[in-house]
Amino acid sequence: MKFEKLGQSGRARRGRLTLEHGVVETPVFMPVGTYGTVKGMLPRDIEDIQAQIILGNTFHLYLRPGLEVIKQHGGLHDFIKWNKPILTDSGGFQVFSLGAMRKIKEEGVTFRSPIDGSKVFLSPEISMEIQHVLNSDIVMIFDECTPYPATHEEAQKSLQLSLRWAKRCKTHHHDELKNKNALFGIIQGGMYEDLRDESLNGLLEIGFDGYAIGGLSVGEPKEEMIKVLDYLPNKMPHDKPRYLMGVGKPEDIVEAVRRGVDMFDCVMPTRNARNGHYFVTDGLVRIRNSKYRHDQGPLDPHCDCYTCKNFTRAYLFHLEKCGEMLASMLGTIHNLRYYQRLTEGMRDALDNGTFDEFVQDFYARRGLEVPPCPVDE
């Protein structure tokens, strides 16, 4: 993996990632393909919205269809017919979302499969082996996602376990498996700045190809999230990619880019599309509202996606009211293209030296003031 920083405005960065299966321009949004598919999308649809990289889920693919099936296809790329880069999460977040269904020990985590109730064991080494079979361009370490809320003691105990697991991930990935694909560390520590520092410094000692911010978008108030983003990205290595995991409101992505983050993923655009909530240049359209019944305009006149070029809001309203599958498909195409256009717009603005104007326009269209942002030291 190679990362180049091509430009900067304040703390916002313009970069380029070169991976085994292609080049990724940053800032970038990665559509989530949990089970080896982005819900409601054909592979050619994902190409059409100009996604550069997608995310796969180690936990779910390990349980179903299982490694043997994917191994027979030579990896996840051929299995799902996607020839561009793939990032896979380690399965840690999903395991720790199981609550009482899992038991954490130093060796790893034992849990009951949500599919059939069978007992499953997942460890740092097993996670690395799964992602090696998947042949992910970017592999994420296996860690414990610190819950919210957590006391200082709980968050510290959790991050220290994650650091021990991080070292095991690095050893197995590089030394045992000889995997040449990128391995990213994940910074934990809850909402505590001293613990975030401890986690980051521990990961830097081990050494990774990129660094992710974990443990956000887990129920904390937005003010808490912004507080972490105010100080943490700027402490992360300036020559490595920075990835904010699972944070996905458009405003949150813009604010994170302003603070120096490069990579994003979230289920929000696909999940919201299935509920008739569509992101547009001026904010949000809730298409089930009766005011759209006779609306002859496109969903977003500024959008170049298949949905906006071909269909009216009235038609989308009709599909939603009828419960037609096509409503979710067209909405997903639009929402994911919106997210690609958002990050494209930020990349162009960073290239052209107009990033501040981009941010001002983004908020002005929503009738909002530009929030304060730390200036570069």
Curated annotation (Swiss-Prot):
Organism: Acinetobacter baumannii (strain ACICU)
Cofactor(s) essential for the protein: Zn(2+)
UniProt binding sites for Zn(2+): C303, C305, C308, H334
UniProt subunit comment: Homodimer. Within each dimer, one monomer is responsible for RNA recognition and catalysis, while the other monomer binds to the replacement base PreQ1.
Name recorded for this polypeptide: Queuine tRNA-ribosyltransferase
Gene coding for it: tgt
HAMAP family (alphabetical): Q_tRNA_Tgt
EC number in record: 2.4.2.29
Tagged with keyword Ribosomal protein: no
InterPro entries referenced in this protein's UniProt entry, alphabetically: ArchSynthase1/Queuine_TRR, TGT, TGT-like_sf, tRNA_ribo_trans-like
Keyword Membrane in annotation: no
